[in-house]
């Protein structure tokens, strides 16, 4: 996030349960999960508003890897055995896709409902796994634990690059947060918040009501 020039960034874990049914389409699944995370953090920040001040810009994201041969949504491996099985499945499929949903929120100045502005987007990248990777290399990679906390079980920015033959789309989307898309959402949300501030009471109709009352007198 430092690349986006944000002066102060606080990482706040979301307590939202990632329990949506895997039968959803991948883009539906990631979008619903990212939105759920953003709302959870926003609500938590509202509860501590007196102590910490009004919530700032909230950015939430969720990433899944999809085995395009079966349509299976792959998240983080649950164990070493599932990690090995996941990478072997990706090797057999050869092609898979990475979906990242981003949800950006900012509080509105006015009391207008729902009290915040939100913008969302989904980034999609096609990835080709190297079909010539051996079982031994997969096991050795799993033992490094580099991909244990990553959707799909590998990190393209690290040793996991030896497993990948190529990508079509955003590199940022595979290794983390798609920066260009995220920046665009931030600009839209902040513009909405600024518009709400400029509208103020005039656009709520208060002045017009007062003028009508004066005319009646």
Regions found by a protein language model. Give the residues of each.
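Short, acidic/turn-prone active-site loops that include or flank metal/cofactor-
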Residues: 13-22
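N-terminal G-site helix/loop of the GST-like fold
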Residues: 1-11, 189-192
């Amino acid at each position: 996030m430092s690349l986006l020039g944000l002066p102060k960034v606080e990482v706040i874990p979301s307590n939202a349960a990632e329990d949506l049914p895997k039968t959803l389409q991948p883009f539906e699944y990631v979008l619903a999960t990212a939105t759920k995370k953003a709302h959870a953090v926003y609500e938590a920040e509202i509860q501590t508003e007196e102590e910490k001040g009004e919530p700032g810009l909230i950015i939430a994201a969720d990433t899944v890897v999809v085995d395009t041969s079966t349509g299976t949504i792959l998240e983080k491996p649950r164990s070493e055995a599932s990690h090995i099985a996941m990478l072997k499945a990706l090797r057999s499929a050869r092609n898979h896709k990475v979906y990242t949903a981003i949800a950006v929120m900012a509080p509105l100045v006015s009391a207008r409902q729902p009290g915040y502005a939100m913008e969302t987007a989904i980034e999609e990248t096609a990835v080709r796994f190297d079909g010539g990777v051996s079982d031994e290399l997969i096991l050795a990679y799993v033992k490094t634990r580099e991909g244990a906390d990553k959707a799909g079980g590998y990190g393209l920015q690290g040793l996991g690059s030896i497993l990948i033959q190529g990508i079509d789309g955003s590199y940022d989307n595979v290794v983390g947060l798609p920066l260009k898309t995220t920046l665009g959402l931030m600009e839209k949300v902040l513009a909405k918040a600024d518009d709400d501030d400029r509208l103020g009471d005039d656009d709520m109709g208060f002045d017009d009501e007062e003028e009508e009352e004066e005319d009646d007198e």
